[in-house]
Amino acid sequence: MRRPALWSRVRSTGPAAALVLALAGPGIAVPSSAVAAPAAPITPTAVSASVSVDAGRALATVPATGVGMNVAVYDGNMNHPSVPGLLKDAGTGAVRYPGGSYADGYHWQTHTVEGGYVAPGTEFDAFMGTVRTVGAQPIITANYGSGTPEEAAGWVRYANVTKGYGVKYWEIGNEVYGNGLYGATWETDHHASKTATTYATNLVRYAAAMKAVDPSIRIGAVLTTPGAWPDGITGTGDPADWNHTVLSIAGAKIDFVVVHHYPIGNSQADLLGKPQAEIPGMAATLRSLIDRYAGGNAPNVGIAVTEVNANAYKNTSPNGLFAPDEYLTWMENGAFTVDWWNLHNGTDCTHVTTVEGAKDYDDGGILSSGASCEPALNTPFPPYWGTRMITKLGAPGDVLVRAAGSTPAVSAHAVRRAGGDLAVMLVNKDPAADATVTLSYAGFTPSSATPTVFSYRKNATSIGSTTTGTATRQTVPAYSVVVVQLRPAR
């Protein structure tokens, strides 16, 4: 059983304690969970890998909302003038609001959080201004813990009728299973009953009230992440575990399911193997549950992964490699959005370490909050650059196709692009040795021209590009992400 982990984010029934720190200014965050010890030094050895790409075997279409980001109303810099450009350049197609566990205490009409700090300039309309500038879609988490169906329906009316924002995706609550039902409490929930049965019953009421205002919206149900605590545990008062109970009651009334993924990596290598080791099984389990309980509507019920991040190495190169692997593996397995936690998260500067020659501030943000120990506000951390590499691989509407590698040390993703081009992402997970990668293709014959190659290298602060190698042989630097762009033979 996986223990309930308290990440560097707001996950408390007493959010005031966490966010009193935010009142002190940028760079203050909730104390973090334990961080895995640095990996032992690795003696460089040659890495050789083969990667086969089947351009005719489609896995998924790159969704417009695939690359997502979380923002939180306690972040006074969430709408900073630099933010829209940074998000747009990273290919951000979805932005989630009002911020994790804060959602279950957030009242949109008064722009307040029960017991919590709300930064000036983070109102819903200001958020929507940023989202529209980015060209992304909002994902809204309605207040289940201390709200009502009527309050949520009022938000839909304001957003989509009064303002015409066209907000499509609405989650009902955040990590509601953390309400004490299973013995751990980090999520606000004022309902007398904390059972999955109660949540599902109320979820149906929320869906009815909100869709009465705008039938075109999509409603998401909070599920536990398959294989992670408390998945599989039957709580007191429920007939089955959380997921089976919720979907048996509400499965026919929802449009997507919601999970979060914070893999626990006990070393750098362990973390970097998690996307391939965990995501396919999780996604298959979710799809099986949907097929079982959603009836004839099952093909239309999506999977939303509305929070992801690593549990360690947050601001250093391992997380820069983890990010694109995480996003793309979820998309390949059917998720329509994968949302990084968080835009800015902050740090108290008490857990600064050195990882692969760079400072790690234990800050869960993808951009610096500008704390005293950190680089300037909005400086991108490695996960930002790793995520931005996805824009070199493909765009919404392109097709993710099968790419298989011969060794876990090098992961691969491929996209068949509009117009017939192909792009391949290679992630070298060895921190010390370059990888020589031999590539082969089915359903695509590459041009003999030297390909364009984009790269994000260890501890770099930008993405580089060059023409190098061939379509069938590339050298991938240690701890780097490269994208090889190929044209078809004419």
Write out the residue ranges for each language-model feature:
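C-terminal beta-strand-rich structural cap/linker in extracellular carbohydrate-active enzymes
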Residues: 467-490
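Flexible loop/turn segments at secondary-structure boundaries
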Residues: 75-78, 102-106, 147-148, 177-179, ...
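Secretory targeting and sorting signals
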Residues: 2-38
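Solvent-exposed beta-hairpin/edge-strand motifs
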Residues: 442-461
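Noncatalytic carbohydrate-binding groove/subsite architecture in carbohydrate-active enzymes
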Residues: 155, 195-327, 332-333
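N-terminal catalytic cores of secreted or lumenal carbohydrate-active enzymes
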Residues: 42-255
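Carbohydrate-binding surface patches
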Residues: 406-445
